[in-house]
Regions:
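Low-complexity, acidic/Ser/Thr- and charged residue-rich accessory regions of DNA metabolism proteins
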Residues: 257, 261, 296-364
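Conserved phosphate/pyrophosphate-binding and hydrolysis machinery centered on Walker-type P-loop NTPases
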Residues: 87, 114, 152, 156, ...
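Phosphate-backbone recognition surface of nucleic-acid-processing proteins
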Residues: 211-214, 220-221, 225-306
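Glycine-rich, often acidic, oxyanion-interacting loops/wings at catalytic, nucleic-acid
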Residues: 123-211, 314, 335-340, 348
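Phosphate- and other anionic-substrate recognition elements at nucleic-acid/protein interfaces
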Residues: 1-171, 250-252, 285
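Short alpha-helical "patches" and their helix-cap loops
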Residues: 112-119, 179, 238-245, 288-299, ...
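Non-catalytic, well-ordered alpha-helical scaffold segments
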Residues: 56, 74, 92-95, 118, ...
């Protein structure tokens, strides 16, 4: 089998073909729009592509032509030799990808290739997140201007009513630059509201999202963001694997045989992690609908503090939601109750009761 390394670009892409024996057969630079035609003329090969904006569509088209495709995440490409020694060209990158595919085979690190439906859902979630970030920047600018005028941080209101509060505070003396940002915030509020309405419609039409929304604190935005990020739940071997993917796994600093746990690694899906933390806050604050998970988090909060409890609850929420998608089950609060730790003496007593014939050996 041949190994084809492709360094995709917005207009032109570099291609390198390595034979099954590891020899470079072909190196070429073509227009990105011609990559699909080029792959159609090659025999069934393994295609290695660095993750980028164009990689998903090229990977899907290559799979349709019976190629074995590996989209390599950007965080791993440097370990494959790309960009080392401060020399980085498209031609060298394509060659390193092809050689890495030949040497590593099935061990070549790669990411999940999303379907069209999953990609569209992810684009919807990211569009809202992008607008929310822009709105936050505009609000922070206005608050900074208010502080310069010795007016404090401004009105403590939601983003939707923030502009009205600022206009009431400043009246006709509102500076031009502040007015410009307030107008921007008004426009962003309308656009965000429109996207959230669409997300609500999509969530109501989605059976998995409807099941996830039965969890306290999980609404249309959180459920769709989770579905968009996970895509295929079977690609995670365990709940710990999922938590690591989201960045909710605890870090570790071990030296001299002494294990020390640190804070969460905070890697991977930043947007989803933030939404899960918000959902955990909502569950903890929902006093009327206290659930076993929330009770466990409240007990943890007494011992370790609010932040640790919220992160731990967000991690548990993610694992429960993943298990529901994997098994196709509905939410049952009683199934999320943590297992109670048994006293060692009680465990021994149960073992003796379960095996009467061995009681003397256990007692002795």
């Amino acid at each position: 089998m041949e190994h084809i390394g492709i360094d995709l670009g917005a207009s032109r892409s570099a291609i390198c073909v390595v034979s099954s024996g590891g020899e470079v057969m072909l190196e070429r630079t073509i227009r990105t729009g011609e990559v699909e035609r080029f792959l159609g003329k090659r025999p069934t090969s393994r295609v290695a592509i660095e993750s980028c904006a164009e990689s998903r569509l090229i990977a899907i088209r290559a799979r349709e032509q019976a190629h074995d495709v590996r989209v390599v995440p950007t965080v791993f490409v440097r370990s494959l030799g790309i960009g080392t020694r401060r020399i980085k060209t498209d031609k060298r990158d394509a060659k390193n990808l092809a050689i890495a595919s030949f040497r590593l085979g099935d061990e070549l690190p790669h990411i999940h290739i999303r379907s069209d439906e999953s990609a569209a859902l992810q684009d919807l979630v990211r569009a809202r997140s992008s607008l929310v970030s822009q709105r936050t920047m505009a609000i922070n600018f206005v608050r900074a201007q208010l502080r310069k005028a010795l007016l404090g941080r401004g009105p403590r209101r939601s983003a939707k009513t923030f502009c009205a509060g600022v206009r009431e505070l400043l009246g006709e003396d509102t500076p031009l630059e502040v007015n410009a940002h307030l107008a921007t915030i008004d426009v962003l509020n309308e656009q965000i509201e429109g996207l959230e309405k669409k997300m609500k419609v999509v969530a109501e039409a989605s059976e998995p999202a409807t099941r996830l929304r039965k969890i306290t604190g999980v609404g249309p935005i959180v459920s769709l963001a989770f579905l968009a990020a996970i895509a295929d739940p079977t690609r995670f071997a365990s709940g710990s694997h999922l938590a690591s993917y989201i960045g909710l796994s605890p870090g570790e600093s071990t030296t001299g045989g002494k294990v020390r746990r640190t804070g969460i690694v905070a890697a991977g899906q930043k947007q989803l992690r933030a939404l899960l933390v918000q959902a955990a806050h909502s569950m903890l604050n929902a006093r009327r609908t206290r659930e076993p998970m929330a009770e466990w988090a409240v007990e943890l909060e007494r011992r370790r503090g609010r932040k640790v409890a919220v992160c731990a609850l967000a991690r548990r929420l993610a694992i429960v939601m993943w298990a529901m998608l994997r098994d196709g089950t509905r939410y049952d609060p009683t199934m999320t109750r943590p297992r109670e730790r048994q006293d060692p003496s009680e465990q021994l007593a149960r073992a003796i009761a379960a095996a009467p014939g061995q009681s003397r050996c256990l007692a002795g």
